[in-house]
Amino acid sequence: MNTKTQPRFLITGSSGLLGSAITSILDSQGISWTALHHGEEGWDPESGVFDPKHLEGITGVIHLAGEGIAAGRWTDNQKQKIHDSRVKGTRALAEGMAAADQKPAVLITASATGFYGNRGDEICTESSQPGQGFLTEVVKDWESAADPARDAGIRVVHLRLGIVLSEKGGALKKMLPPFKFGLGGRLGDGQMWMSWIHLQDAAQAFVTAATKDSFTGIYNLVAPHPVQNSDFTTALGNALKRPTVFPVPAVMIKLLLGEMGESLLLASTRVLPEKLEASEFEFTYPKIDEALKDLL
């Protein structure tokens, strides 16, 4: 980033769980930012509409917006929304940035460890090949949608998020009610790997990637110690001081949630943040016990 220019970021999805944490860090560091809200004139990610006027005075873009992948069963219509809101929105931003007279220096986009698919015990790093399935295809299209910005010489960073842990939203918030009543348990056989990250570490990584010119390309945004679901279940029970003796059969998850349940709850993804650690990024919460203790 040009050190002579005061940074000012344009942020999509700024009111969401991750966006709110990112903007809080930016505020604490005195870094300016502007929100680009869905429905605002000149911005419709699902339709691929972006007016470059929003880039005036902007030095970088942090793109978080997209249809929630756990918002409902994956009907054909919902899958199209998940895909288009990410791919068309990212491409519109990248093309707008590439065409701007005063090009922003950096585009930071959210991505997902869903790229790796269901891999059992295999360890995945940024150099691993893609897996198979709907999420893999979404991520491949999503990341390549930023090519116009990359081709224009703009620094592009893709942060492949694992399960972002926060008591305020996302997966953990949905898990808490049954666990608090002592009705929690492992999913299926509990052997599937969960690649997770504390919300604060995820937000700090976005800010670091946005403000450090050395960050470029793909980074796995996960804690350095993934856990199997059975161990996560035990850690959550310990944090809440509740028993965890009610497993949820895999067949029930498939029956109730279909493909979404198989991909988000039963798939095993053991991902390591190899590039993030090589960059000397420091995790505040590298292990699941301390992360849950802080959150709960």
Q: Where are the regions that the model predicts?
A:
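N-terminal Rossmann NAD(P)H-binding glycine-rich loop of SDR-like oxidoreductase domains
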Residues: 8-28
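Glycine/proline-rich active-site loop of Rossmann-fold NAD(P)-dependent oxidoreductases
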Residues: 140, 152-154, 165-174, 209-219
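Alpha-helical substrate-binding/gating segment
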Residues: 176-184, 192-226
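Mid/C-terminal beta-alpha module of Rossmann-like enzyme folds, strongest
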Residues: 212-259, 293
